[in-house]
Amino acid sequence: MNDFTPKFRIGNGYDIHRLVTGRKLIIGGVNLKHPDNLGLDGHSDADVLTHSIMDALLGALSLGDIGKYFPPSDDKWKDVDSLILLSKVIDLVRKQGWEINNIDSVLVAERPKIKPFVEIMKKNLSNTLKIDNSFIGIKATTNEKLGPEGREEGISCHSVVLLEKKE
């Protein structure tokens, strides 16, 4: 074991939730309207974008995943706004002396169209994380009718974060 402390850490996050009736469709803190009135199933609000960012942040510091901190077995987190959870995760990251350098996320969904809401999502995330929204990249794509996202069974998100050690 050496005494080397890296200046940067990279984290990768992924989340997917099933589309169901009777639930809201919250992505990046934005309540979207699905053409078939579907929403994402989950214990919290099932915000795949916010969940994948949280997992990337935790993973960058080898702190486990969001289930460790907000287990679905705990009713305290039932239907909670994921931006509240994100604020708890970023507090943990900062207590360890790290800051976000940037975030890059890719949402995968056939419908609804995500692009018109990207700037609002970035604003919600940047306000929660207390970073400039230029540090956050959000892209949306389809799966070309392939896989669970392509069959409109669910929506997923991949995120990468770069953390920098504060001096």
Swiss-Prot record:
The record marks 43, 142 as: Transition state stabilizer. One of its GO terms (biological process) is isopentenyl diphosphate biosynthetic process, methylerythritol 4-phosphate pathway. Gene3D superfamilies: 2-C-methyl-D-erythritol 2,4-cyclodiphosphate synthase (3.30.1330.50). Binds 1 divalent metal cation per subunit. The keyword DNA damage does not apply. A divalent metal cation binds at residues 15, 17, 51. It catalyses: 4-CDP-2-C-methyl-D-erythritol 2-phosphate = 2-C-methyl-D-erythritol 2,4-cyclic diphosphate + CMP. Belongs to the IspF family. This is 2-C-methyl-D-erythritol 2,4-cyclodiphosphate synthase.
